[in-house]
Amino acid sequence: MNQIASQNAPSPKVVIPHYAFGGLTWLAVTLLIVFNPDAFTQHFFNPELLAITHLLVLGWITMIIFGALYQLLPVIMEVKLYSESFAIASFILLGLGTILLAFSFWQFSFGTIMFVAATFVVVAVGLFVANVLFTAHSSTKKVIERTFIVTSTIWLLFTVLAGLTLAVNQVHPFLKTSQIELLKLHAHAGIVGWFIQLIIGVSSKLLPMFMVSHHVNTKKLTVAYYAINIGLIAGLVSLFLQVKFGVILSALIIVPGIFSYLSFIYEAYTKRVKKQLDIGMKQTAFSFLILVIPFFLIFTLLFNFKFLNNLTPPLSVAYGSAIVIGFITSLVMGQTYKTLPFIVWLKVYRGRIGKVVLPLPKDLYSEKIAIAQLWLFAIGFVLLLIGISASITRILFLGGTILLLSAALYNFNLFKIIFHKPKNK
């Protein structure tokens, strides 16, 4: 606990609003899924799905990651966060930009609001990247986790700039590559460059710490780093130049890199001293099981089997949903229970440690509700994926409804933690 809430940690007022905004956005997204299941049965380039996707990746996942990273950077790099002012400004701009961007996509309007929103997001990301880079620069701790985090932020900046370029190209076409291929480039830069590498950088530090694992082989992370980045660059260039063989080759480089990271996590799991996994770690473990699905789908889509031609559009949506709604969302919810309670606990009880009997951080939320939330999420996600793959809106609606219940329970626990009042007065 002291490792997560280190002396270098920023004010909780910087971190906690990110969790609150992110949780409410996830709840809003599940509502949109319930009332717009048809968005998942069309080609992925449709207004509703674009709006939902950007709410997911910016307002929910990236927002939570920003907040968590402000808390964790001082732990990983052993220095104070460079600027809390940058963090607050970035939060405000990202929140406003995400809402306006989602509204513009929903209206499929590429006018003034869209470009104001995109500018807000780009500036927010720019402030975040500057904060991370300046923090990293002041650190003398040169570890592979630091390299992953710094690299992921560069990819995030590339991703949002690519998104802005896409919006400009939609209104004033100047690129020969089709918008669909450019959208794939934008999406994979974000998924593999930003999310996957950030997850590797943070989890390779935190998960062994949470499981109390020692002497795990970090060379596996170095292999993962070079394989993922070489493969990603090759893949993006191939997408832009529309060289299909290059795209397939890039996947054949990236996937073994991810498996090298998963091997590191499995080794940490087998060497763990703490045998009993709590609910946060159980949901984290479930998220890694979900990864099997996008691995299977990506090669199914790349090799373009003739008998699956009619299924290509729904399988493409299923692939993205498995990564964003399945793997990353599950991981974020699981790690919320491993980070936020410690942050709030220290804020509330900092001056009383050792003086009175205090509740544990895990006492700040309801474990029964967290377990119910995990089961509902698992059932809802499976139904959602079946509904997408089979293009059956009734199953999509049912899956979305169950995900809504899961998101509601997650938010109940989230705000129970955030508004926790001190006990043993």
Where are these regions (language model features)?
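Hydrophobic alpha-helical transmembrane segments of multi-pass integral membrane proteins
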Residues: 1-425
